[in-house]
From Swiss-Prot:
Reaction(s) this enzyme catalyzes, per UniProt: RNA(n) + a ribonucleoside 5'-triphosphate = RNA(n+1) + diphosphate
Entry GO CC: DNA-directed RNA polymerase complex
Classification via InterPro entries: DNA-dir_RNA_pol_omega (IPR003716), Pol_omega/Rpo6/RPB6 (IPR006110), RPB6/omega-like_sf (IPR036161)
Family statement: Belongs to the RNA polymerase subunit omega family.
Subunit structure: The RNAP catalytic core consists of 2 alpha, 1 beta, 1 beta' and 1 omega subunit. When a sigma factor is associated with the core the holoenzyme is formed, which can initiate transcription.
UniProt record, GO biological process: DNA-templated transcription
Ranges of biased composition (kind: Polar residues): 121-131
Entry's EC annotation: 2.7.7.6
Upper lineage: Bacteria, Pseudomonadati, Pseudomonadota, Alphaproteobacteria, Hyphomicrobiales
Protein name, entry field: DNA-directed RNA polymerase subunit omega
Keywords: DNA-directed RNA polymerase, Nucleotidyltransferase, Transcription, Transferase
Keyword presence, Ribonucleoprotein: no
GO molecular function, one term: DNA-directed RNA polymerase activity
Amino acid sequence: MARVTVEDCVDKVPNRFELVLLAGHRARAMSAGAELTVDRDNDKNPVVALREIADRTIMPEDLREELIGSMQSRVETEEPEVEQMQLLMSGEAAGEVKDTFGAAEGGGERMSEEDLLRAIQSQIDSPQQKSADADDMDGED
């Protein structure tokens, strides 16, 4: 029965290897509780997945996007600007922030917006670095 189903699907997904990937992904989704779009007829999940693809009740393009999304392990984040990164990597930024805080608390010079943003960023980055170091220690056994 599965051979006939595979033959029915080849015109919807021309590459048999991709067809197997998509049907396998759909079968795992069914096992996890996804709703069926065709009658089960006492068939196993991979056969039902192939029948769904053959009947076009599930679109291969949608399955492909779901499969790609499930395989991605992390989301790309924006890279910090090179200039800011260089400031953070050098010891100058930390010294400037301390001087600026001291001046602001003493009632002397006012802190510029740029200095305030650097100070906030250094405060944000510091706890993240400590928690990342703690995570690295937990992972080592």
